[in-house]
């Protein structure tokens, strides 16, 4: 074989080997890429951002409060009726308390004592000794912002069972008003005692009792008509609702008529009610004002007598009444501990002014600071005299109501 031929053969063999090597390299690279395809062809995963939970704000203590005003008896005598008569034969008592409405309408809770039964005109309007008042009395007080009414008095049964039933039916038409002291059945009484009222995040119960009945007892088996006080009844009533509410408010018709002094029975009942967990006791019946007091290490605030709010008992002592303000305050701590207290008591005196024309007319309720000498001579002297009575057991009492501002 010639050398030229051998060289050609070697070149050809070299080309073949070169091609084989190239193919081997390509194949190896392809195999490597296939095996590691995830590394080359898979998009890198984006890092998922973890959602940051909002930081919880530290728990803060909370405070709730409801401002309450209390006034005394709506004791409606002939003079008050006659002054309120309208040409159409009806009654309008609103002008008589219009000035005080500017104060009472500013409060969360506004209380008064309805001394005379609202039996309505159909039973005959009457005055002392057996009272019966038209529904328009209630209308006037509701219009002035009053939304808590005590009905248990020594005059509840003045018109018998029908008088009470008429009164109960009237107040049923005003569910926005908390009433206590008269009911038409035992079931209604129980529901009323255990009813939970609420204002501004504060819950409260309201119960009314009287220790007097003027010898006019309820019919046998119908004690619910007038809420007469016994220690046993009060204990059962209060225990049935105490743990359901922040505050228990009790209205007591008690004390000695026309006496500025608190008697032993009032003190005894007040201390007993306080031991049951009552926070606020509001008194009526004496028809004159008495002192106020914080008892049981501040657990219970007692207003022994608010006196008359409106009447025709023609004497300065009876024309003078007490308007009392307190704040029901609830504090909820960060550990949910709840503390409730009756705080910031404030007081003002009110007076029933009249125009005398052989009899009293033009009845108006105004506060003592607004009195003139024409309306009451020596009103400044009376003011200091009556303030001293109220201050007897609470000497640091603040005078002047928030609602007067």
Locations of regions flagged by a protein language model:
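Acidic, metal/ion-coordinating pockets
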Residues: 2, 16-18, 24-405
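N-terminal Lys/Arg-rich, disordered targeting/topogenic segments
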Residues: 1-13
């Amino acid at each position: 074989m010639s050398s030229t031929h051998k060289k050609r053969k070697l070149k050809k063999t070299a080309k073949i080997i070169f091609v084989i090597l190239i193919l081997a390299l390509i194949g190896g690279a392809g195999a490597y890429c296939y095996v590691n395809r995830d590394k080359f062809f898979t998009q890198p995963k984006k890092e998922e951002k973890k959602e940051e939970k909002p930081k919880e704000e530290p728990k803060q203590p909370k405070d709730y409060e409801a401002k309450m005003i209390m006034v005394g008896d709506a004791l409606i005598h002939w003079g008050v009726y006659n002054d309120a008569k309208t040409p159409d034969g009806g009654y309008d008592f609103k002008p008589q308390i219009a000035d005080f409405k500017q104060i009472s309408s500013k409060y969360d809770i506004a209380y008064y004592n309805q001394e005379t039964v609202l039996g309505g005109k159909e039973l005959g309007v009457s005055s002392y000794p057996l009272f019966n008042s038209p529904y328009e009395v209630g209308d006037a007080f509701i219009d002035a912002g009053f939304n808590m009414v005590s009905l248990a008095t020594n005059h509840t049964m003045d018109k018998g069972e029908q008088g009470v039933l008429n009164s109960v039916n009237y107040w049923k038409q005003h569910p926005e008003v908390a009433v206590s002291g008269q009911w038409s059945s035992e079931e209604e009484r129980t529901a009323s005692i255990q009813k939970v009222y609420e204002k501004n995040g504060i819950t409260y119960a309201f119960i009314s009792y009287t220790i007097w009945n003027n010898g006019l007892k309820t019919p046998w088996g119908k004690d619910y008509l007038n809420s007469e006080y016994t220690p046993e009844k009060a204990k059962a009533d209060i225990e049935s609702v105490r743990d359901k509410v922040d505050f228990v408010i009790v209205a007591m018709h008690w004390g000695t008529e026309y006496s500025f002094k608190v008697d032993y029975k009032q003190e005894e009942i007040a201390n007993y009610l306080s031991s049951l967990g009552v926070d606020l006791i509001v008194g009526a019946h004496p028809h004159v004002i008495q002192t106020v007091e914080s008892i049981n290490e501040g657990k219970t605030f007692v207003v022994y007598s608010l006196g008359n709010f409106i009447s025709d008992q023609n004497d300065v002592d009876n024309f003078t009444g007490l308007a009392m303000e307190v704040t029901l305050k609830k504090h909820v701590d960060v550990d949910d501990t709840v503390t409730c207290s009756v705080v910031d008591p404030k007081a003002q005196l009110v007076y029933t002014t009249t125009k005398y024309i052989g009899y009293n007319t033009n009845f108006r309720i105004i506060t003592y600071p607004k009195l003139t000498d024409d309306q009451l001579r020596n009103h400044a002297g009376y003011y200091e005299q009556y303030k001293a009575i109220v201050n007897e057991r609470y000497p640091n009492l603040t005078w002047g109501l928030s609602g007067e501002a």
